[in-house]
């Protein structure tokens, strides 16, 4: 569940509502490519803009059409009660794992974030992935907090932000995390432009926005990493440098991937 390529698709919109037909077209690309898992309703999946009913519907569609590929569903919300309700919806839909970001309006402190994860893992019957995405949550996990949360019995993985641009520094960062996190907790890199560094450094998987639209090239990277072919990992990432440059130019991946999906005819042009 928490290794290889976890592809994070868009939740496309049309006329202000989720475009189910377009969502299924995106899913078909991922199932055809046989990605290792699906990360649905993450930041790329616009979870924060959807109602509970809309999220439940997208969750049901994802699991129904995943063709036995495990689905991880994001349950991020501002209130703990809402998070628990979303967790229940996700599990009823058939989620294999839950992706939990520490979402808040007021800035959260570390004890509050720990309590959130403690509460969710106590109620959940599937493993939880720690979603460390300071770009959207505006909360930064300290290593000490990651270690506290990772020690909870229900935690299965941590989705880390991009690793350092220098490979030696990325190696050091992964070694530091490996030295403190439980062996049972996998480490998945995000921040697509630095995914190659993370995979070469030893991340178990890639939580990938790029993989949600271009799954075959992303899977080629994770498979090369698993085989120890670091030269191929680097070459595949170098091919995508124009895409990484667009991510930097436009303040992240979301707008770029949305535009690309429209240009490919998979979604409305302004999805």
Where are each of the predicted segments found?
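Active-site beta->alpha loop and helix N-cap motifs at the rims of alpha/beta catalytic domains
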Residues: 1-140, 146
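Catalytic alpha/beta core domains of metabolic enzymes, predominantly
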Residues: 122, 134-241, 247-248
């Amino acid at each position: 569940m928490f290794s290889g390529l976890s592809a994070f698709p868009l939740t496309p919109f049309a006329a202000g509502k989720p475009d189910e037909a377009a969502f299924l077209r995106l899913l078909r690309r991922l199932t055809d490519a046989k990605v290792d898992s699906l990360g649905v309703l993450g930041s790329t999946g616009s979870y924060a803009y959807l109602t509970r009913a809309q999220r439940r519907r997208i969750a049901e569609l994802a699991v129904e059409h995943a063709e036995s590929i495990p689905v991880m569903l994001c349950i991020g919300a501002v209130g703990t009660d809402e998070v628990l309700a979303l967790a229940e919806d996700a599990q009823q839909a058939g989620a294999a794992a839950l992706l939990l970001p520490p979402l808040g309006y007021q800035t959260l402190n570390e004890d509050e974030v720990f309590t959130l994860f403690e509460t969710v893992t106590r109620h959940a019957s599937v493993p939880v992935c720690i979603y460390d995405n300071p770009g959207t949550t505006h909360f930064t996990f300290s290593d000490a907090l990651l270690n506290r949360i990772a020690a909870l019995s229900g935690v299965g993985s941590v989705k880390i932000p991009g690793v350092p641009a220098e490979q030696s520094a990325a190696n050091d960062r992964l070694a530091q995390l490996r030295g403190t996190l439980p062996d049972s907790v996998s480490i998945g890199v995000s921040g697509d432009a630095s995914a190659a560094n993370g995979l070469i450094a030893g991340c178990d998987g890639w939580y990938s926005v790029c993989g949600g639209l271009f799954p075959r090239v992303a899977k080629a990277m994770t498979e090369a990493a698993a085989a120890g072919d670091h030269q191929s990992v680097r070459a595949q990432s170098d091919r995508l440098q124009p895409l990484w440059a667009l991510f930097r130019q436009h303040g992240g991946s979301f707008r770029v991937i949305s535009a690309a999906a429209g240009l490919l005819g998979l979604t409305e042009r302004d999805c």
